[in-house]
Every structure is written in structure tokens, then in C-alpha cells.
UniProtKB/Swiss-Prot annotation:
Gene Ontology cellular component terms for the protein in this record: plasma membrane
Protein name: UPF0761 membrane protein CKO_03126
Domain of life: Bacteria
Family designation: Belongs to the UPF0761 family.
Bridged cysteine pairs (disulfide): none
Keywords: Cell inner membrane, Cell membrane, Membrane, Transmembrane, Transmembrane helix
Membrane topology: Multi-pass membrane protein
Length: 290
């Protein structure tokens, strides 16, 4: 009896085990951790230029002045765990210094920010193993659109949320609003990863695969934030060793961990489609033989 149950369980879990084996094989072949390290390095170099460009765009639109503060607080509170306040102070100092740069220096900041997007594009197309290339002008237009419209849309959504919260009728829905706001970072991460996996690759990505991969990445990202914050709180070895400089290795590790999650979601998205094709090919071969 137990043997039959065990055999049935193995039979039902065989597709899952085969998919996990394929996923591990792709992660190994694509050198996912190395790609994550490369992106982490480029991200750390581009972090200040990217933030400087984003908030310079907000400064160009006076109506977004209040939203800029809300967006800044939201980013550091929800995307950088535990040490967000310290990192925010340093980055704001760097951004303030960058505002004193000349036009040539400002162009350099924009180019550096665009290089990060190019690195992300290259890494994801490596995972999708797509050899198709977009025209340079088209790629630049897409990167520039993301760089300009992305922050403005995020700011607009925060402004709308603040307006709705200020309405009298909304005060009666405090419990519902609190619950929605509690899962809002997860939903925002899910949508962001879905757009990343759907738009950036130069090959067609099935929407359902992108949704699943983005959801896994979003859950891991939110869990990673809480786990990382808990680790820093419970095991403050970095503070003991590095002292006031502890924020530097903490930021390095967090950025690397974030890119590992992003690329893992991409690998899951790719593997879902590849496994489905392999399964269909095997079924077709069995049908031909019979």
C-alpha cells in the first residue's frame, strides 16, 4: 500500500522534478550568479547618476515637488532594507553635489544611467539566448522613455493615492486602505518584473510565463527584504567589523542579492516555455512512434 502511494507520488512529481532539473541546468549554463555580479557592479556605479537624473526630472516639473519627496521616501522605505535611512542621507548628498555639475557632467550622468539599462538589456537577452538586436536608435528611445516616463508615472500614481486618501469618504475605509497599502510594494514589484520580462527581451515571451516568473521574483524580493533586515538586526557582524562604513558592504550585498532574484525570475520565465516545448516534442515523438 505504502509502496503504491510512493510510486504515485513519484509519478505526479516527475514533471516538477524534470522542470527543476532543467531550471538548474539553465542557471548553471547562463552563469546566473556571475551575471548578477556584473549587474550589481554596474548598478553601484550608476546608482547616484540614475537617481540624480530621476529627481532632476521631478525638479523640472514644479507640480511634482511634493510627489518627489513621497516617491523618495517610498523607494528607500520599500526597496532598501534596514539601512535605508543611512543610505538615503549619503545618496542625497551625492545628488546635491551632482546638481552643481556643468552641462558636460550632466550628460555624463545621463550616459552612465543609460549604460545600466543597456547592461540589463544585455543580461536578459543572454538568459533568453536571443540573438536578435534592436536598432540603436530604437534602443536609446526605449531606455530614455523608461528613464523619463517611469518616474513620472510612479509619481503620478503616488499623487493620485495621496489625493484619494485625503477624501472624506476614504477615511471610512481605513482598514481596507491599510490592507491594500500593505501589499502595494508586492504588487508594484510584481508589475515591474512582469514588464521587465515582457518588454526587454528581443524575442516573444508568453504572457503567462512572464506573470509566473515575475510573481516568484516579487515574492522572493519582498521576503528577501524582510530576511535581510532580520539578519542585519540579529547578527550585526558588519557593524562590529566595519563600524561607520558598514553601510557600504550591506548595500553591496543587497544589490547583488536583488539582481540574483531578478535573474532567477527571468530563468524561471524562460524555463517554463522551454519545458513546455520539450514536453510537446516528446509527446509528438511518442505519437509518431505509435
Amino acid at each position: 500500500m505504502l509502496k503504491n502511494v510512493h510510486q504515485k507520488a513519484r509519478h505526479h512529481t516527475r514533471p516538477v522534478r524534470a522542470w527543476l532539473k532543467l531550471l538548474w541546468q539553465r542557471i548553471d549554463e547562463d552563469n546566473m550568479t556571475t551575471l548578477a555580479g556584473n549587474l550589481a557592479y554596474v548598478s553601484l556605479l550608476s546608482l547616484v547618476p540614475l537617481i540624480a537624473v530621476v529627481f532632476a526630472l521631478f525638479a523640472a516639473f514644479p507640480m511634482f515637488s511634493d510627489v518627489s519627496l513621497q516617491l523618495r521616501h517610498f523607494i528607500f522605505a520599500n526597496f532598501i532594507p534596514a539601512t535605508g535611512d543611512v543610505i538615503q542621507r549619503y545618496i542625497e548628498q551625492f545628488v546635491a553635489n551632482s546638481n552643481k555639475m556643468t552641462a558636460v557632467g550632466a550628460c555624463g550622468l545621463i550616459v552612465t544611467a543609460l549604460l545600466l539599462m543597456y547592461a540589463i538589456d544585455s543580461a536578459l537577452n543572454t538568459i533568453w539566448r536571443s540573438k536578435r538586436t534592436r536598432p540603436k536608435v530604437y534602443s536609446f528611445a526605449v531606455y530614455w522613455m523608461i528613464l523619463t516616463l517611469g518616474p513620472l508615472l510612479a509619481g503620478a500614481s503616488l499623487a493620485i493615492s495621496s489625493y484619494l486618501l485625503s477624501l472624506r469618504w476614504a477615511s471610512e475605509l481605513n482598514t481596507v486602505i491599510d490592507n491594500v497599502l500593505r501589499v502595494f510594494p508586492l504588487i508594484l514589484s510584481w508589475i515591474s518584473f512582469w514588464l521587465l520580462y515582457s518588454i526587454v527581451p528581443t524575442t516573444r515571451v508568453p504572457n503567462r510565463d512572464a506573470v509566473v516568473g515575475a510573481f516568484v521574483a516579487a515574492v522572493l524580493f519582498e521576503a528577501g527584504k524582510k530576511g535581510f533586515a532580520l539578519y542585519i538586526t540579529m547578527f550585526p557582524s558588519y557593524q562590529l567589523i566595519y563600524g561607520v562604513l558598514a553601510v557600504i558592504p550591506i548595500l553591496f550585498v543587497w544589490v547583488y542579492w536583488t539582481w540574483c532574484i531578478v535573474l532567477l525570475g527571468a530563468e524561471i520565465t524562460v524555463t517554463l516555455g522551454e519545458y513546455r516545448k520539450l514536453k510537446q516534442a516528446a509527446e509528438q515523438e511518442e505519437a509518431d512512434q505509435s
